[in-house]
Amino acid sequence: MKSILITTFAVLASLAARDALPATPESPLRGTWTLVAAERLLPDGERVADYGASPTGRLIVDSQGRYSLQIFKSERLRFASGDKARGKTDEYESAVLGSSTHYGTVVVDAQRHTLSFRIEGASFPNWEGANQQREYTLADGVLTYRVPPRPDGAIPISVWRKLD
Protein backbone atom coordinates (compact mmCIF):
# COMPACT_ATOMS: atom_id res chain seq x y z
CA MET A 1 0.00 0.00 0.00
CA LYS A 2 2.81 2.38 0.93
CA SER A 3 4.56 1.78 -2.42
CA ILE A 4 1.32 2.54 -4.31
CA LEU A 5 0.98 5.87 -2.48
CA ILE A 6 4.61 6.78 -3.17
CA THR A 7 4.25 5.87 -6.86
CA THR A 8 0.99 7.83 -7.16
CA PHE A 9 2.57 10.86 -5.47
CA ALA A 10 5.63 10.68 -7.76
CA VAL A 11 3.45 10.53 -10.89
CA LEU A 12 1.29 13.46 -9.76
CA ALA A 13 4.36 15.51 -8.82
CA SER A 14 5.97 14.91 -12.22
CA LEU A 15 2.75 15.91 -14.01
CA ALA A 16 2.53 19.10 -11.97
CA ALA A 17 6.17 19.93 -12.70
CA ARG A 18 5.62 19.34 -16.42
CA ASP A 19 2.62 21.66 -16.47
CA ALA A 20 4.59 24.34 -14.61
CA LEU A 21 7.19 24.63 -17.40
CA PRO A 22 6.84 27.79 -19.48
CA ALA A 23 5.51 27.35 -22.99
CA THR A 24 8.03 27.58 -25.80
CA PRO A 25 7.65 31.00 -27.43
CA GLU A 26 6.17 30.88 -30.92
CA SER A 27 8.60 31.65 -33.74
CA PRO A 28 8.08 35.15 -35.20
CA LEU A 29 8.78 33.55 -38.60
CA ARG A 30 5.85 31.13 -38.27
CA GLY A 31 4.03 30.78 -41.56
CA THR A 32 4.62 30.38 -45.27
CA TRP A 33 6.96 32.71 -47.15
CA THR A 34 7.54 33.09 -50.89
CA LEU A 35 10.86 34.10 -52.41
CA VAL A 36 10.93 37.66 -53.73
CA ALA A 37 14.64 37.90 -54.61
CA ALA A 38 17.84 35.85 -54.48
CA GLU A 39 20.84 38.05 -55.16
CA ARG A 40 24.57 38.23 -54.54
CA LEU A 41 26.39 41.29 -53.28
CA LEU A 42 29.77 41.19 -55.03
CA PRO A 43 32.96 42.40 -53.32
CA ASP A 44 32.90 45.55 -55.51
CA GLY A 45 29.38 46.42 -54.22
CA GLU A 46 27.43 45.35 -57.31
CA ARG A 47 24.21 43.33 -56.73
CA VAL A 48 23.51 40.58 -59.25
CA ALA A 49 20.95 37.79 -59.62
CA ASP A 50 22.06 34.61 -57.86
CA TYR A 51 19.43 32.13 -59.07
CA GLY A 52 18.56 33.58 -62.46
CA ALA A 53 16.12 36.28 -63.51
CA SER A 54 13.02 34.76 -61.87
CA PRO A 55 13.97 32.55 -58.93
CA THR A 56 11.24 30.73 -57.04
CA GLY A 57 11.13 29.39 -53.53
CA ARG A 58 9.28 28.68 -50.32
CA LEU A 59 10.21 28.96 -46.68
CA ILE A 60 7.80 27.29 -44.27
CA VAL A 61 8.28 27.70 -40.51
CA ASP A 62 6.08 26.12 -37.84
CA SER A 63 5.32 27.55 -34.40
CA GLN A 64 8.32 25.77 -32.84
CA GLY A 65 10.84 27.00 -35.44
CA ARG A 66 11.05 23.84 -37.55
CA TYR A 67 11.56 24.94 -41.14
CA SER A 68 11.84 23.77 -44.73
CA LEU A 69 13.46 26.05 -47.32
CA GLN A 70 13.72 25.70 -51.10
CA ILE A 71 15.21 28.11 -53.64
CA PHE A 72 15.23 27.27 -57.35
CA LYS A 73 16.65 28.90 -60.45
CA SER A 74 13.77 28.93 -62.93
CA GLU A 75 16.14 28.46 -65.89
CA ARG A 76 17.35 24.99 -64.80
CA LEU A 77 17.81 22.53 -67.64
CA ARG A 78 15.21 19.82 -68.11
CA PHE A 79 16.55 16.28 -68.37
CA ALA A 80 16.28 15.29 -72.04
CA SER A 81 15.82 11.61 -71.10
CA GLY A 82 13.03 12.41 -68.63
CA ASP A 83 14.87 10.11 -66.19
CA LYS A 84 16.71 11.56 -63.20
CA ALA A 85 19.09 8.58 -63.18
CA ARG A 86 20.11 9.13 -66.83
CA GLY A 87 20.96 12.82 -66.89
CA LYS A 88 23.88 14.38 -68.72
CA THR A 89 26.66 16.25 -66.93
CA ASP A 90 25.26 19.70 -67.77
CA GLU A 91 21.77 18.64 -66.61
CA TYR A 92 23.10 17.42 -63.24
CA GLU A 93 25.18 20.57 -62.85
CA SER A 94 22.17 22.76 -63.58
CA ALA A 95 20.02 20.82 -61.10
CA VAL A 96 22.59 21.05 -58.30
CA LEU A 97 23.81 24.62 -58.83
CA GLY A 98 20.30 25.85 -59.62
CA SER A 99 18.84 24.92 -56.25
CA SER A 100 19.38 25.41 -52.55
CA THR A 101 17.26 23.34 -50.19
CA HIS A 102 17.55 22.53 -46.51
CA TYR A 103 15.46 21.86 -43.42
CA GLY A 104 15.91 21.83 -39.65
CA THR A 105 15.21 24.43 -36.97
CA VAL A 106 15.64 28.18 -37.05
CA VAL A 107 16.14 30.34 -33.95
CA VAL A 108 15.50 34.09 -34.07
CA ASP A 109 17.61 36.44 -31.93
CA ALA A 110 15.66 39.69 -32.24
CA GLN A 111 18.16 41.62 -30.09
CA ARG A 112 21.13 40.78 -32.33
CA HIS A 113 19.06 40.60 -35.55
CA THR A 114 20.34 37.12 -36.33
CA LEU A 115 18.80 33.89 -37.52
CA SER A 116 20.49 30.60 -36.63
CA PHE A 117 19.64 27.77 -39.00
CA ARG A 118 20.42 24.37 -37.47
CA ILE A 119 20.51 22.31 -40.64
CA GLU A 120 19.40 18.69 -40.35
CA GLY A 121 19.24 17.85 -44.06
CA ALA A 122 20.32 19.69 -47.21
CA SER A 123 20.76 19.28 -50.95
CA PHE A 124 24.42 20.20 -50.31
CA PRO A 125 25.50 17.45 -47.88
CA ASN A 126 28.36 19.51 -46.38
CA TRP A 127 25.74 21.70 -44.65
CA GLU A 128 24.14 18.82 -42.76
CA GLY A 129 24.71 19.19 -39.03
CA ALA A 130 25.85 22.81 -39.45
CA ASN A 131 24.59 25.83 -37.54
CA GLN A 132 24.53 28.77 -39.97
CA GLN A 133 23.96 32.29 -38.73
CA ARG A 134 22.55 35.14 -40.82
CA GLU A 135 21.90 38.83 -40.18
CA TYR A 136 18.28 39.71 -40.95
CA THR A 137 15.64 42.41 -41.09
CA LEU A 138 11.91 41.79 -40.75
CA ALA A 139 9.46 44.59 -41.56
CA ASP A 140 5.97 44.75 -43.05
CA GLY A 141 5.86 41.03 -43.81
CA VAL A 142 9.21 41.04 -45.65
CA LEU A 143 12.17 39.01 -44.36
CA THR A 144 15.62 39.80 -45.73
CA TYR A 145 18.79 38.01 -44.67
CA ARG A 146 22.42 37.82 -45.70
CA VAL A 147 24.30 34.56 -45.88
CA PRO A 148 27.96 34.55 -44.76
CA PRO A 149 30.34 35.34 -47.66
CA ARG A 150 31.15 32.59 -50.14
CA PRO A 151 34.79 31.72 -50.90
CA ASP A 152 34.75 34.25 -53.77
CA GLY A 153 33.69 37.02 -51.34
CA ALA A 154 30.13 37.32 -52.70
CA ILE A 155 27.35 37.62 -50.09
CA PRO A 156 24.06 35.93 -50.98
CA ILE A 157 20.95 37.92 -50.01
CA SER A 158 17.51 36.29 -49.79
CA VAL A 159 14.27 38.27 -49.63
CA TRP A 160 11.00 36.57 -48.61
CA ARG A 161 7.40 37.85 -48.39
CA LYS A 162 4.97 36.30 -45.93
CA LEU A 163 1.93 34.68 -47.56
CA ASP A 164 -0.21 34.03 -44.49
Which residues make up each language-model segment?
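Bacterial N-terminal signal peptides that target proteins for export
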Residues: 1-8
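A broad "ordered helical/assembly scaffold" signature
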Residues: 1, 13-14
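Lipid interaction determinants
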Residues: 9, 15, 20-164
